[in-house]
Design a protein with these regions (language model features):
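Immediate post-signal peptide segment of exported/extracytoplasmic ligand-binding proteins
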Residues: 2-24
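Surface-exposed patches in mature extracellular/periplasmic domains of secreted proteins
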Residues: 7-13, 53-55, 124, 128
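Short, well-ordered beta-strand elements
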Residues: 19-29, 51-54, 71-72
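Detector for C-terminal structural segments
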Residues: 31-42, 61-184
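Short alpha-helix C-terminal cap/hinge motif
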Residues: 40-51
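Short helix-initiation/N-cap motifs at beta->coil->alpha
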Residues: 53-63
Length: 184
C-alpha cells in the first residue's frame, strides 16, 4: 500500500525507496506493558511491519515525548469533563510538546478548537465538536484502541463514596462511620 511493500523478500515491508521500515515504540519495563507489546508485535508482524520496543521508565518516556523524540508511545487518559474539549486539546497545534504529545499541527483543526473554546453549550458548539472530531479521526495522530473499565469494591463502614464521572479524585468526599460499641 502506497509503496510500503516487501521488496527484498525478507517478510518485512520497506519504505518506498527500499530502505527498511522499522517502527520504534517506547514502552515501560513492566509486566502489563510487556503483554500489550507482545500483542501489538503479533499483529504488526501479521501485516509485515517490524516493530522494536524501547523500554524506559515512564518519566523518561514523557520527557522524550514532550521533546518530540518518540515515534510511538502508548499512554492512557481519563475524561476531564462532560464534552471532551480537554481531550481535543491533544490535537491543538499550540499545545505541541505539552498536552499534544504527537505534535500534531493542522490549521483547520486549530481554528475549530479556538472557536470551540468561546462557544456556550448548544447546537453550534456541537457542530464544531463534530467537525473537530472528524478531522482528528481522519488525520489520526493518536490511535485510540483501549477503553478501561474500573470496578469498585467498598467496605461497609465507608460513608459518602460515589465514583465521580470525571477525574479520579474521590477520597476527599468519604468518611468512615464510627463503629457501634461492642463491635470489633
Amino acid at each position: 500500500m502506497y509503496g510500503y511493500v516487501d521488496k527484498n523478500g525478507d517478510g518485512w515491508r520497506e519504505l518506498p525507496d527500499g530502505s527498511p521500515l522499522v517502527l520504534m515504540s517506547a514502552t515501560q519495563p513492566d509486566q502489563r506493558n510487556r503483554q500489550l507489546n507482545e500483542l501489538l508485535r503479533k499483529h504488526m508482524n501479521a501485516i509485515g511491519l517490524n516493530i522494536v520496543f524501547k523500554p524506559a521508565k515512564w518519566p523518561e518516556n514523557l520527557k522524550a515525548a514532550r521533546a518530540g523524540k518518540l515515534q510511538m508511545w502508548g499512554v492512557a487518559s481519563t475524561a476531564a469533563g462532560g464534552d471532551g474539549q480537554s481531550i481535543l486539546e491533544r490535537y491543538y497545534g499550540p499545545s505541541a510538546g505539552q498536552g499534544n504529545l504527537a505534535r500534531f499541527k493542522l490549521p483547520a483543526f486549530d481554528a475549530l478548537f479556538e472557536k470551540l473554546t468561546g462557544l456556550a453549550d448548544g447546537p453550534e458548539r456541537e457542530a464544531v465538536f463534530r467537525d473537530a472530531k472528524r478531522l482528528a479521526v481522519a488525520y489520526m495522530p493518536y490511535k485510540l484502541h483501549c477503553h478501561r473499565f474500573v470496578v469498585d469494591m467498598m467496605y461497609g463502614d465507608v460513608v459518602g463514596y460515589r465514583r465521580p464521572a470525571y477525574w479520579l479524585d474521590w477520597w476527599h468526599m468519604i468518611d468512615v462511620a464510627p463503629q457501634p460499641a461492642g463491635r470489633a
